[in-house]
Each structure stands twice: as structure tokens, then as C-alpha cells.
Amino acid sequence: NKSSSPNLTLGFTSSNSYDLKNERKVGYMASLNYRSNISYFDDYLESRYEKSLPAFANTVYNTGKLGKDERFISFLGGIAYGSKKGKQKINFLFIQNGESTAIQGDFLNNGENNYDGVGQIKSYVQRQIISIPFSSKNYFLDGKLEANLSFTPSFSRVYDKDFKTS
């Protein structure tokens, strides 16, 4: 297992709250993170076993070199407003991951793949999550009645951007 620079992790965070007139407050938070990780394996081995009577049988045996480049970025931001009459909060969360993989090796025909010999596999996959939680708490009749509202629209996607064999 070899690692190639630039494996890197960076993070930035900021938050604060402010007092306003008439016992009101407003606050914010923000966080940004980035990570990259590059790995290389000289002795990659893919092996799958199937249970067949009376013993386990090796059905796939591929060897070679594997390189992997993973990138991860996330952002979390939000604002809040509060007063005697209630509090409202909204946040925004974004997470994205990209992964590139390259394999150069010897591949054996296994029924799934009709190829015997030396070859290359290159792939790129990207995953993404977006979430926007909102909540509101309101007081009425001098605090005798409370009304709450919250919802969180969320979206997730997986993109198989690229897959090549040769």
C-alpha cells in the first residue's frame, strides 16, 4: 500500500450570535470541509468465493495494480432568529464525494466477465446529498399557546459518470 501526496484535509468554521433590540437575537454558523485521499496498491487481489457442495469454490481471481483517488467536500450553513414570540432556524447541508478508480491487471473469465487476459478498468462515481432543514417555534397568548412547524426537504443522487474497460 502506497500513498501519494497530496493527501489533504482542510476545514473552516465560523459562527456567532448578535443581540438585537427588544430582546431579539440572530445567529449564524458555517462550516466548509475538504478532504482528498490518493491510494495505490501494487498487489491488488480480488477474490470471491461461492459456497458449493461440499466446499467453498473460488469463482473470481483477479490480480494487478489499483489506484484510487477520493475527494470529499461538505458545507453546513445556517441562520437562526429568536425573540419572545418564537424562534426560526434554517440550515443548508451539502455533501459530495467523488471516487476515481483505475485497475491494471490480469482478469480471469468468470461468467460475469467474458475476458481472460491483461486489461484495465477505469471508473468514476459521484455521490451527492443536499438537505435543507427548517424549524419554527411560535408562542401566542403570552406563551400559553405554542405552534411548531418543521420540515426537511432532502435530495440524494449517485452518478456513475464513467466506466471504461480495455
Where do the PLM segments sit?
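Face-selective signature of the C-terminal outer-membrane beta-barrel domain
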Residues: G82-L93, N97, V125-S166
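Generic structural motif recognizing short loop/turn segments at the entrances and edges of beta-strands
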Residues: R24-K25, G117, G143-L145
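Extracellular loop and loop/strand-boundary signature of outer-membrane beta-barrel proteins
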Residues: N58-K65, Y115-S123, S135, S166
